[in-house]
Amino acid sequence: PSLQVSLFCYPDAPIKDLLTSMSQGNCPVECFAPMASYQHEIAAFFGLNTINIGDTLNQGQLKLTVLPFLTQAEYDQLLWCCDLNFVRGEDSWIRALWASKPFIWQPYRQADDLHLEKLEAFLKIYLKDNPSQILAEFSRAWSEDGITISLWNRLIAEIDELSSWTAQRTQHFESQTDLASKLVIFTENGV
């Protein structure tokens, strides 16, 4: 069976390196990429000038399907259906967290590498108690242009363990009292 992957990123991500790694990696990959600003990088990887919604592109171990830009509900369904999700921005990583599937987050690139500080703060909280370092290593590489085939193969080799850990981590966050409830408790206590 192939690894199901969603790809939603900023155009400055190392897309060519990721697609190369997927195409030359140790397992078949079926990648779903909603049409967005990175479409030119995908087209170039496959030696095309343009790509269109509905295109299915193949190279090596990689089969990539170009999807239309999705509504939020459709995007949530895509996240739930995939084994691994590449997401961008804060809203997408929140949605990926609730999908309870392993994900790699790309923060929006900022001057003076502030996005890397944001990434490190996120990784410190999200990956607390994760015995594996691969999600952190891959996330850093994705934000710093350092994706390699060996790093990709390490990530997919641990995907089953990462899936179990991610499900537990999502349950941990779901068990916490939400902000609205905390505010109600706070006001009821007369503070």
Predicted stretch roles:
Residues P1-E41:
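Active-site donor-nucleotide binding/catalytic segment of nucleotide-sugar enzymes
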Residues K128-V191:
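C-terminal amphipathic helix plus adjacent low-complexity
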Residues M22-C27, F45-I51, I149-I159:
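Short, surface-exposed amphipathic charged segments that create phosphate/polyanion-binding patches used
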Residues F69-K118:
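A donor-sugar binding/catalytic signature common to diverse glycosyltransferases
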